Amino acid sequence: MSDDMSMGLPSSAGEHGVLRSMQEVAMSSQEASKMLRTYNIAWWGNNYYDVNELGHISVCPDPDVPEARVDLAQLVKTREAQGQRLPALFCFPQILQHRLRSINAAFKRARESYGYNGDYFLVYPIKVNQHRRVIESLIHSGEPLGLEAGSKAELMAVLAHAGMTRSVIVCNGYKDREYIRLALIGEKMGHKVYLVIEKMSEIAIVLDEAERLNVVPRLGVRARLASQGSGKWQSSGGEKSKFGLAATQVLQLVETLREAGRLDSLQLLHFHLGSQMANIRDIATGVRESARFYVELHKLGVNIQCFDVGGGLGVDYEGTRSQSDCSVNYGLNEYANNIIWAIGDACEENGLPHPTVITESGRAVTAHHTVLVSNIIGVERNEYTVPTAPAEDAPRALQSMWETWQEMHEPGTRRSLREWLHDSQMDLHDIHIGYSSGIFSLQERAWAEQLYLSMCHEVQKQLDPQNRAHRPIIDELQERMADKMYVNFSLFQSMPDAWGIDQLFPVLPLEGLDQVPERRAVLLDITCDSDGAIDHYIDGDGIATTMPMPEYDPENPPMLGFFMVGAYQEILGNMHNLFGDTEAVDVFVFPDGSVEVELSDEGDTVADMLQYVQLDPKTLLTQFRDQVKKTDLDAELQQQFLEEFEAGLYGYTYLEDE
């Protein structure tokens, strides 16, 4: 399904007619700069995402073609008018292809800069995102590309697509005989298939099946390094890693192959420090250690031809350019320079040939290309009213709160903001306890809570974010007073890493970014689980527990974009509350301002999700029909209820507008 949306959809660059005619609502460059800093778009957006003159998010899938832009807010509204359901993934295959070109270009520059004679090859590990649209977009990019598999199912997908590229295939993960035989079949078909030995028991099966198929195996070895990265994924590297061979086992593998007359089959050295490496120093240390394995294996007579440094190339989810778990303190060029220099230096020092360098950079290729867009279905916000004095005979705790409120408005008072806040908190605590004991009425409790909110609001206005001593109080008050936004999505399905490992993703409204973010909000999903909430948000150069929000109409809140969800999230998403896959569209943007949208995934229906848990929709419909027939409802109402039930079975799992 393809829709040409070039008619009626303005692009956000080259908007010579539509946007230029709306200068009365266009924001100043100063306002734009402030919004970019608030959400750090300039850093995590990586030139793919920006704020246009209308205060809308714009997307430039290929920064080398800056005139090819689309207003994302306008695109979503146009799609909604055409029947697009939310939540939905908006995928930009051109970003995938630009990421691939950028990584290849960085390594080309590094090789030229350091006089490195070996080749470079990017291998895409499909575990990061196995969707056909992703794999085929990368394969059809025109760039050299290999594929990596970590299971039998992935290897079958890779082999089927390999005919389009005739390229390198790397086989990682634990392997049984069927997996190994599939890989050897690929080698026999003419592909370069590297079977990476992860444990010693695999080598006997490899040699046995290679003989059966009369094929020379192409082998790799994964060395377990002492070096280890830091962060959420550090356990995938280091001496305690689940994968790889220790130094003793590497020697044992070499001798086993020598005795079998297959030492020439060992052609690839592989290591992996961990995913999303935040610190370039950790990467440099790991590459230097692995380079020693390359040198020592050559001394043992092993002609290693490929040096696979694995994954680890991170992306800056926060936009803080730091060593935090969800950021990186380096760019593509520095990453490539460190790898090429370390390997080349070891080769020059020992008079060895420069091997082909392979990286398995999945996250860095796919993260940016997908945005989850959803609608806010409800807002709960604190409204501040002018407080009235309590009755003269009101209990002491109420009188105390009122006295604090009056003192806050007296000129020249010497008490601190913190002291006012603490006094009001203690009074409110006493009132809550007294309410449970029957001392205070419901009306008195409500009055105290409303007055406390007004006091918090008053204190907040007088705090200075630049004053370090004020920051803890500001954070506390922002959490207490933030708007609660109920968003039509499942955190567990669409952003499982935000729940499982507390990963941060950029989240912000798609419009209204021409206004100062005066409000704060927390985002809650529609699952029946208190964990279904986003706990951390980008806020300038730091991370906050509430999200900056421009002023908005609570009856018509803006759509929200959840950015950089292209790596792992679609694959790891689970079925909590039986919320399924969202709809997905591929968006192509062209220099003339035209946009082409293709529906790539219709999303799961309720029936789809029920079948996952062995609940047959037809059986459920029959059971429901039997119940309805036994009621004393009239025939017309019975038929109406049956039709509604059946329509619901084959409808979207998310909330839909009537």
UniProtKB/Swiss-Prot annotation:
Pathway: Amine and polyamine biosynthesis; agmatine biosynthesis; agmatine from L-arginine: step 1/1. The keyword Protein transport does not apply. InterPro entries: Ala_racemase/Decarboxylase_C, Arg_decarb_HB, Arg_decarbox_C, Arg_decrbxlase, De-COase2_CS, De-COase2_N, De-COase2_pyr-phos_BS, Orn/DAP/Arg_de-COase. It catalyses: L-arginine + H(+) = agmatine + CO2. Its EC number is 4.1.1.19. Homotetramer. Catalyzes the biosynthesis of agmatine from arginine. Belongs to the Orn/Lys/Arg decarboxylase class-II family. SpeA subfamily. This is Biosynthetic arginine decarboxylase. It comes from Escherichia coli (strain K12). The gene is speA.
